[in-house]
């Protein structure tokens, strides 16, 4: 019986799910908008909302909790330095999910998950490694 089982398995092991959502959290914080499948977006939303709430609370212990959840120091800095002040007056509801049709190939339902009041210039900026960062 599935009583009390609230999360989707997404056909992955627990370690794979944890790593996938850590990467997706970092990507969403970096670009402030990502396209993924609808079930993944629905599972990602509460994780990101809790991270933004950690950022709003501030403090070293909350920063360490965010680092252990996300494992990307640059995005944790952005979370605490940019996103937390942006949403300081908002009580939850930091993200929205917009259905985006179906994927060609397997007809999977797609969705766009983005931050409410997001920075339009953040999308696509600094995607992937650059030669300056590899040389340094």
UniProtKB/Swiss-Prot annotation:
UniProt keyword terms in alphabetical order: Ribonucleoprotein, Ribosomal protein
Subunit structure of this chain's protein: Part of the 50S ribosomal subunit. Contacts protein L32.
Listed InterPro entries: Ribosomal_bL17 (IPR000456), Ribosomal_bL17_CS (IPR047859), Ribosomal_bL17_sf (IPR036373)
Gene Ontology CC entries for this record: cytosolic large ribosomal subunit
Name of this protein: Large ribosomal subunit protein bL17
Recorded name of the encoding gene: rplQ
SUPFAM superfamilies, A to Z: Prokaryotic ribosomal protein L17
Family annotation (HAMAP family): Ribosomal_bL17
GO terms for MF: structural constituent of ribosome
């Amino acid at each position: 019986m599935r009583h009390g089982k609230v999360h989707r398995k997404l056909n992955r092991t627990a370690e794979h799910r944890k790593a996938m959502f850590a990467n997706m959290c970092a990507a969403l914080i970096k670009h402030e908008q990502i396209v993924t499948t609808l079930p993944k977006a629905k599972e990602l939303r509460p994780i990101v909302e809790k991270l933004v709430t950690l950022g709003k609370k501030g403090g070293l212990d909350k920063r360490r909790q965010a680092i252990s959840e996300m494992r990307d120091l640059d995005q944790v800095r952005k979370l605490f330095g940019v996103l937390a002040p942006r949403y300081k007056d908002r009580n939850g509801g930091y993200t929205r999910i917009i259905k985006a049709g179906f994927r060609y190939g397997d007809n999977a339902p797609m969705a766009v998950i983005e931050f409410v009041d997001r920075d339009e210039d953040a999308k696509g900026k600094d995607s992937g490694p650059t030669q300056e960062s590899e040389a340094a």
